[in-house]
Curated annotation (Swiss-Prot):
May play a role in the regulation of cytokinesis. The keyword Nucleus does not apply. It holds the Pfam family Atx10homo_assoc. This is Ataxin-10 homolog. InterPro entries: ARM-like, ARM-type_fold, Ataxin-10/CTR86_families, Ataxin-10_domain. It is found in: Cytoplasm. The keyword Nucleotidyltransferase does not apply. It comes from Eremothecium gossypii (strain ATCC 10895 / CBS 109.51 / FGSC 9923 / NRRL Y-1056). Belongs to the ataxin-10 family. Keywords: Cell cycle, Cell division, Cytoplasm. One of its GO terms (biological process) is cell division.
Length: 534
């Protein structure tokens, strides 16, 4: 149904906006006539639907935006009036796009809007911010069904997305920008190009993470180990989690992280820790998504493992370097330990020689790290501790102790790589479970002895004893060679009988005098790992 009156009024406004003269007096009159059209399109569903199906209406909106010239320098009053008029047209488009996305897509309205926003000489006054808010809402509606990404408009899209950086964390902009960005990152082609764009860091790190997530959601509380229920996120928090789910599962995320680490450690570290939260807080990943995440996590693990080897070989403690290595290692090991319950990921790790990398890294950490045992502090007394080297000899050297423990806070420093060995052994446990190839490889690479040597309580690696015992159980299960190997170690008193008992085995001497292991039917072995492997 045609609406000649509305078309004429919109045409008059478009001409007024596009007029080069800042003194054009018809703009105020045209604005007054636009007001009722915008209001009725918001309140009257039938009217809104009728207008949305009128191609001439959409054409007038496009013509207005095309010639708005918001890049010109004007006095405050005419600039305000021109922006108010453009905002009115955008609000009308926003209302109509609820009903119809086909016509504005055919007229390339998306590209026209982001081109308009790219022209703005940013002053961040009230009307300018209001115009952007309306524009983001329109862009969200236009991209709900499809992002219809145009490669040539990437620069304008990025400029539009980075605008809120100058708005001092405006919450008014946070929600509409996040909704629009979510629609865009669901498009593989856009995300592939976006993560290579120079503005990606500003948008992803400075605006989305530091601006929106840190200032307007509860998600940083989780990263900072504060209590929060991820099941009851705010709308903005849930939207950001959806955005990041798209980012971390895209093939371009891995090279993006590599580039980011090379020039901005702080941004890389924050993004990596937030990616860890996103990845490990959901079990709804499909096989393709699991693989995409594992690709970047495993690459970081491989490169970090190599750096850890070099660091430990030097034998010189460097807290700054150790802190970075430890932080990276902790994040990716946590992700791999969570994902190792999936068969496809276990196969991925094995295919890319992950067992070798895990065992070698465990060996370097075993030789480098001290075992720590804290005793609970009594009232008005500091906690005491004992430190042991890799040969389980007591360490008394005060300098060495201070290099790994903060005496004042009784906390372990990154130079001792806390929790890393425990996570490696947990991953090995998953890989070894009912897998003869991994069982044998662990023996051949002398990983069996490494796991056995960690069947002790160590405050540097919480739960390492329980995880090691469970891993030993899986290494020995239905594997005569491994059982014989451990039996020979036990005969040399290299293995604690209690460890074998907890793993469900006991040493027996056969009639031929040979030492072997047998399952102890009376041993109650409690599973301390999630063995619901899929």
């Amino acid at each position: 149904m045609a609406h000649p009156s509305e078309v004429a009024q919109l045409g008059l406004l478009a001409k007024s906006v596009n007029n080069e003269s800042a003194e054009f007096t018809g703009l105020s009159d045209a604005l007054e006539k636009l007001g009722p059209i915008v209001r009725n399109s918001s309140l009257d569903h039938n009217y809104r639907k009728e207008l949305s199906e009128d191609r001439a209406i959409w054409k007038e909106i496009c013509d207005c935006l095309n010639g708005a010239h918001l890049d010109r320098v004007e006095e405050k009053e005419p600039r305000h009036l021109r922006m108010r008029a453009v905002r009115g047209m955008i609000l009308l488009g926003r209302n109509l796009s609820v009903e119809n996305q086909r016509l504005p897509q055919e007229l390339a309205l998306h590209s026209r809007v982001v081109e308009l926003l790219a022209q703005v000489q940013c002053q961040y006054d009230e009307m300018e911010i209001a115009l952007h808010k309306a524009a983001y809402e329109l862009l969200y509606n236009l991209t709900r069904a499809s992002a219809t990404f145009d490669q040539q408009s990437l620069g304008n899209v990025c400029r539009a997305l980075r605008y809120p950086l100058g708005a001092h964390g405006s919450r008014d902009l946070a929600l509409p920008v996040s909704l629009y960005f979510l629609n865009m990152v669901r498009d593989d082609e856009f995300l592939f190009a976006f993560l290579k764009h120079p503005d990606a860091d500003k948008i992803v790190y400075q605006f989305m993470l530091q601006g929106v997530i840190k200032n307007h959601t509860e998600l940083f509380d989780v990263i900072d180990n504060k209590t929060h229920d991820l099941e009851n996120l705010s709308s903005l928090g849930a939207i950001q989690m959806s955005i990041w789910s798209c980012l971390v599962t895209h093939a371009s995320f891995s090279p993006y992280l590599e580039r980011l680490e090379s020039h901005n450690w702080e941004a890389f570290d924050t993004i990596l820790r937030f990616a860890q939260l996103v990845v490990t807080s959901s079990e709804k990943w499909d096989k393709e998504q699991l693989t995409a995440i594992t690709v970047w996590a495993f690459r970081i693990f491989e490169s970090t493992a190599s750096s850890v080897e070099e660091y430990t070989r030097r034998g010189i403690d460097d807290e700054a370097e150790a802190s970075r290595l430890h932080q990276k290692l902790l994040v990716v090991l946590d992700i791999l330990s969570v994902f190792s319950k999936y068969e496809s990921i276990r196969k991925f790790i094995m295919f890319y020689n992950g067992v070798e990398v895990l065992i070698n890294t465990l060996r370097y950490l075993q030789n480098h790290c001290m075992r720590i045992n804290f005793t609970k502090a009594k009232s008005n007394m500091a906690a005491t501790f004992k430190a042991y080297n890799s040969n389980y000899e007591r360490v008394e050297d005060e300098g060495k102790i201070k290099s790994i423990i903060n005496i004042e806070t009784s906390s372990i420093k990154s130079t001792n790589f806390p929790e890393c060995k425990s996570l490696i052994i947990e991953i090995l446990g998953f890989l070894t479970y009912k897998n003869r190839e991994v069982q044998d490889k662990c023996r051949e690479l002398h990983g069996l002895e490494l796991v056995l040597s960690n069947c002790v309580i160590d405050d540097n690696d919480p739960f390492i004893k329980e995880r090691s015992i469970m891993c030993i159980r899986f290494l020995l299960e239905d594997n005569a060679e491994n059982q014989s190997f451990v039996a020979q170690l036990e005969a040399k008193k290299a293995v604690n009988d209690d460890v074998l008992a907890e793993a469900g085995y006991e040493v027996k001497v056969g009639a031929d005098g040979k030492i072997g292991l047998t399952k102890n039917p009376r041993a109650a072995v409690e599973d301390k790992m999630d063995l619901n492997l899929t």
